Amino acid sequence: MASLIREWVGINTFASATQTKLLELLGKLKQENVNTLTILVMGKGGVGKSSTVNSIIGERAVSVNPFQSEAPTPFMVSRSRAGFTLNIIDTPGLIEGGYINDRALEIIKRFLLNKTIDVLLYVDRLDAYRVDNLDRQVVKAITDSFGKGIWNRAVVVLTHAQLSPPDGLPYEDFCFKRSGALLKVVRLGAGLKRRNKQDFALPVVLVENSGRCNKNENDEKVLPNGTAWIPDLVKTITEVVSNGSKSIFVDKKLIEGPNPNERGKLLIPLIFALQYFFVVKPIERAIGDDIERESRPSWDN
């Protein structure tokens, strides 16, 4: 389900300092001839995807209810400001019953048909203290659906960042360890080889969507480390847009994969070669040996 493009009035709800930073960042994109930005938000259920969408927009554009399951279909929020259009696509969680929800993934892919993904926000919780194989499966499912290139356009977003780390750990140390563990899983799930790691600088941004988020003297929402997180997130998104990698256009081929008939045609020469060397040649040798034996004089046997 998609919404009509509306005037981005939610930006007026931000603190003046935040508004100024956001308009400067969007102005830089327009200078680079980027007039439309489409952000895809993905991850497990209950991690704060919809709340993050609402925080960026500055209004309750997507329904959020902690006591109800997520919407089963994607939803695109579109807002326009001074000739710039921002599209954010909220999606259902990719896990159901401890496994990848293939049906949800298929619905997401069909929804994205003929759309261009400029940035992927991969959302998880900062206060999830461990990663496991399920995280790897989610990353692999995204990679299998949209290709490895999607991670060149990605930002890892860790929600619930207004926390006190366990065991008296310094906040920065805890965030570094948590994000490092998740980034390792992303590399494994995306199938990025060791030689790619230097080129794979996946940015991580911390966010706090709840009303209890602290504020600084400029009335901006800030994290325990003092970062004004809304402009920090938007700044990181604009940096990804400008990093030189290509946006992901979701066409039918990307969704359905290679044509099996075309794939079969590519295998025909290989099959013929194998048949020749392992079937035809041995038969020819055997026939030649038989002819040679039959042509010998009986006394030579």
Role assignments for model-derived ranges:
Residues M1-N301:
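Conserved GTPase G-domain substructure that encodes guanine base recognition and part of the catalytic core
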